[in-house]
């Protein structure tokens, strides 16, 4: 990893709060967004009312609020005058049969991007169990369902979704950039990894046929986009923003032919008098100030213009792995809510309550892994103490990410940037990088950014990365 890439990582970590843009992008609590939008023109409802290191440091656990122990499970009443929607994204599920949980697998987790793939099975099961008590109208999985598009991972996750629907909750899915034609699909065995079978776009739709595609009101012939009715008053516009033909790419794009289909769906929603809620994997707005090319849908202004012309108030996405929320333009324009990765601490999902008058509220809910572990009589200390383990693990992963880049840098590549740093300076810089990145992923950079950016280590980032 080059110094340039590391500097981008650092700015990404700080970017949640250091690049605030207008005030709309940074609510007082980035994990919760509430707004009301009542437009009298289009989008009229029909209802009655209106986020191998050589020498890692000890991670410092963050405060992640645990759920009350021993709390009796109570099921919420179904929402009246609107829809309650659970948003899960970037699960990055890996079939249990594809790993022996050995050395190569553990290294992938500890030197990765923050996903706790070593507990993805338990996190997924716990999340599905927990949301049942919310009585949601639907669970939306907005892409990156699998680690790297392994066919076995898709099939195993689909079996779990079958059980969710048997329990009475509808599930709809769209692909993410990791899910289709991914050359990185692999299994893990000891110190090595081997190529695993991936899936094509047609195979993806077949595997998840029961989770949106078979029940679609309309399917786009040019992509895996479709519409899905949530009762008589609301319709989901599930947009395939991924590029996987002829090869898989990270960035997002809506095909030209798909825009014609989108126009038809906007017109039909208006004619039918239903609220249209668009969902995609990639971001509609420039949520990331560093990774615009990889995160924001290419030429997204075309999609923004179409949606705003029809007064569509809200867009939902994932991909960023970071909890974020912003509005296009300061006092008007579409809102976007980006839900963070389920498998990345704080391991949370979004709960959207969208009322018939087109007002909506959104909050994140942490998966209570400790309660789940006790209920299932787990003896795994990490699960039983997940609220301590998870933030510490995340900090260690981000520390490794930073330290590895500096450790591996060479003078001819970096031009003296890192090679002249002392061991202690590298450690200090990695510590502050880990602190900022971990907070940012949970949508809580605002809690630590003021203190972190006054440290000597942060000033070293400024001196050595941005001279």
Language-model segments: residues:
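Acidic/histidine-rich helix-loop elements
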Residues: 92-123, 187-192, 245-256, 287-290, ...
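Active-site-proximal beta-strand elements of phosphoester/diester hydrolases
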Residues: 82-95, 233-244, 279, 335-340, ...
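C-terminal motif of bacterial Sec signal peptides marking the signal peptidase cleavage site
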Residues: 13-15
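His/acidic metal-ligating clusters that form di-metal
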Residues: 131-138, 170, 235-237, 249-335, ...
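Active-site environment of divalent metal-dependent phosphoester hydrolases
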Residues: 94-97, 147-149, 177-185, 244-247, ...
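Non-catalytic terminal accessory segments
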Residues: 3, 17-81, 374-467
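Extended active-site neighborhood of metal-dependent phosphoesterases/phosphodiesterases
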Residues: 63-77, 156-260, 332, 351, ...
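N-terminal active-site segment of His-dependent metallophosphoesterases
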Residues: 54-151
């Amino acid at each position: 990893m080059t110094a340039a890439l590391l500097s981008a990582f650092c700015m990404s970590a700080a970017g949640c709060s250091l690049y605030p843009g207008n005030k709309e992008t940074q609510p007082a609590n980035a994990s919760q967004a509430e707004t009301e939008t009542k437009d009298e023109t289009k989008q009229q409802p029909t209802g009655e009312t209106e986020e191998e290191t050589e020498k890692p440091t000890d991670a410092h656990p963050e405060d992640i609020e645990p759920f009350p122990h021993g709390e009796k499970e109570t099921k919420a009443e179904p929402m009246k005058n609107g829809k309650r929607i659970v948003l899960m994204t970037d699960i990055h599920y890996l079939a249990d049969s594809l790993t022996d949980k050995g050395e190569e697998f553990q290294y992938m987790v500890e030197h990765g991007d923050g996903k706790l793939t070593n507990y993805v099975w338990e996190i997924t099961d716990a999340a599905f169990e927990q949301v049942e008590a919310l009585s949601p109208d639907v669970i939306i999985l907005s892409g990156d369902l699998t680690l790297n598009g392994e066919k076995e991972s898709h099939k195993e996750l689909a079996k779990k979704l079958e059980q969710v629907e048997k329990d009475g909750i509808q599930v709809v899915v769209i692909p993410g950039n990791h899910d289709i034609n991914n050359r990185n699909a692999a299994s893990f065995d000891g110190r090595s990894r081997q190529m695993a079978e991936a899936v094509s776009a047609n195979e993806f739709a077949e595997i998840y046929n029961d989770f949106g595609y078979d029940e679609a009101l309309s399917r786009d012939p040019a992509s895996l986009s479709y519409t899905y009715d949530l009762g008589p008053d609301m319709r989901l516009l599930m947009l395939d923003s991924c590029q996987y033909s002829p090869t898989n790419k990270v960035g997002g794009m809506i095909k030209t032919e798909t825009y014609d289909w989108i126009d038809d769906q906007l017109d039909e929603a208006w004619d039918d008098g239903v609220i249209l809620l668009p969902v995609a994997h990639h971001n509609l707005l420039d949520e990331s100030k560093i990774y615009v090319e990889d995160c924001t849908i290419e030429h997204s202004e075309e999609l923004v213009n179409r949606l705003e012309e029809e007064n569509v108030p809200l867009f939902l996405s994932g991909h960023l792995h970071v909890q974020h929320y912003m509005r296009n333009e300061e006092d008007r324009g579409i809102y976007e809510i980006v839900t963070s990765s389920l498998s990345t601490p704080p391991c949370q999902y979004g709960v959207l309550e969208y009322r018939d008058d087109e007002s909506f509220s959104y909050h994140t809910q942490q998966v209570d892994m400790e309660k789940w572990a006790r209920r299932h009589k787990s003896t795994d200390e990490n699960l039983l103490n997940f609220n301590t383990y998870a933030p510490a693990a995340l900090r260690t992963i981000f520390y490794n990410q930073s330290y590895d880049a500096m450790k591996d840098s060479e003078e001819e590549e970096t031009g003296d940037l890192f090679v002249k740093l002392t061991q202690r300076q590298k450690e200090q810089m990695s510590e502050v990088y880990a602190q900022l990145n971990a907070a940012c992923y949970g949508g809580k950079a605002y809690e630590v950014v003021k203190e972190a950016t006054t440290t000597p280590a942060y000033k070293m980032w400024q001196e050595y990365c941005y001279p």
